[in-house]
């Protein structure tokens, strides 16, 4: 079982073959590029069953992804324009694309949408029944048939990532007191379902109009080079999809949207850093913020009013474990999922927290949480420290 594998990762995963990691890297490349270019991609049932129950076996089985045939040419152009000598288009036909990474190959099978299901082209094989449900697998978006996860008799209804990573726990909080107790007793990231900081776009725009200071952000999460502009221009560029920098830590002048008990709490907790209790969030997709940690004012949070982001989090104790063994943000910043799993004899397998946050979700994480964020939909909202 995947959950058992995750619990004993230091024993079972420490001896994984080179071919396993080559295959996992190829699979992650497929998923990340489909994610970036908004191509819906799924696994056929046999592959889905394999990765859910025995991921170690991926090197000895045929791995098949599926996409709608209308996305075929766009999928091909992605890899033809990608500067990566490790991956090549090994075979092309009307019903299949084969990608090669050294000695490892993966097939992308073409499907036609017919009424309520997808049928593989030139095949009488299984049908993939719509609607498809989005999940996370090895840190990226993948789609599965709703039938596979709604059938209580199905033995593979567990979460995809179990064994490789963990889902970020979700909590429903109706009062600030419940939020306070949650974060003060948590050493892991949490997603909080709450009405706090909910705001209509028209009211968000009032905050924009009241903003006197420029709004700043970064162009790259490697160099952290900053850009800034006045609030009206920044918001206009965001809505027109012309915003060319990512905004997360720029303080909001008007903090009246903070509930009184929240405001009192952060004034005491943040002290001279109170200005960062409420900050702007604006990001245009697709965007990757590489692994980093935030200033140690307090735990960080992000409340999405609209949009979607995938979060990868490495908890403070696990991050410190890596630092103590010579790793740093500089060496880890650009690592993909496949690479970060292999650090220190696969230490992080089963330890990385991952999830998707969407409209209305609030994510909070402790000080010194190493995190990476993938923006899959244009997103705006609030951030800050709590």
UniProtKB/Swiss-Prot annotation:
Q: Which domain of life is it from?
A: Viruses
Per its UniProt record, what Gene3D superfamilies does this chain match? Cupin
Query: What is the protein name for this chain?
Result: Uncharacterized protein L613
From which organism does this entry originate? Acanthamoeba polyphaga mimivirus
């Amino acid at each position: 079982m995947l959950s058992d594998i995750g619990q004993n990762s230091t024993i079972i995963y420490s001896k994984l073959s080179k071919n396993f990691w080559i295959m996992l890297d190829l699979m992650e490349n497929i998923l990340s590029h489909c994610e970036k270019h908004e191509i819906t991609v799924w696994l056929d049932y046999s592959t889905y069953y394999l990765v859910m129950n025995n991921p170690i076996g991926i090197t000895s089985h045929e791995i098949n992804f599926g996409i709608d045939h209308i996305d075929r040419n766009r999928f091909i152009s992605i890899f033809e324009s990608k500067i990566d000598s490790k991956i090549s288009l090994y075979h092309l036909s009307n019903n299949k694309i084969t990608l090669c990474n050294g000695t490892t190959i993966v097939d992308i099978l073409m499907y036609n949408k017919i009424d309520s299901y997808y049928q593989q082209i030139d095949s009488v094989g299984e049908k993939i029944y719509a609607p498809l449900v989005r999940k996370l697998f090895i840190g990226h978006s993948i789609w599965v048939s709703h039938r596979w996860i709604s059938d209580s008799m199905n033995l593979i209804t567990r979460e995809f990532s179990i064994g490789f990573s963990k889902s970020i726990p979700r909590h429903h909080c109706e009062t600030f007191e419940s939020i306070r107790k949650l974060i003060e007793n948590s050493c892991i990231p949490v997603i909080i379902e709450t009405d706090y900081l909910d705001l209509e776009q028209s009211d968000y725009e009032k905050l924009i109009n009241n903003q006197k200071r420029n709004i700043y952000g970064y162009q790259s999460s490697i160099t952290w080079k900053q850009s800034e502009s006045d609030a009206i221009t920044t918001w206009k560029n965001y809505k027109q999809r012309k915003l060319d920098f990512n905004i997360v830590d720029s303080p909001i002048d008007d903090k009246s949207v903070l509930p009184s008990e929240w405001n009192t709490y952060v004034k005491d907790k943040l002290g001279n850093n109170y200005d960062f209790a409420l900050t702007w969030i604006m990001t245009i997709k697709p965007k990757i913020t590489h692994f980093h940690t935030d200033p140690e004012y307090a735990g960080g949070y992000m409340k999405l009013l609209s949009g979607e982001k995938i979060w990868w989090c490495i908890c403070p104790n696990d991050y410190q474990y890596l630092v103590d063994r010579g790793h740093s943000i500089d060496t880890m910043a650009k690592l993909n999922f496949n690479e970060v799993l292999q650090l220190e004899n696969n230490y992080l397998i089963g330890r990385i927290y991952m999830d998707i946050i969407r409209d209305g979700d609030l994510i909070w994480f402790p000080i010194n949480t190493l995190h990476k964020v993938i923006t899959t939909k244009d997103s705006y909202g609030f951030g800050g420290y709590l």
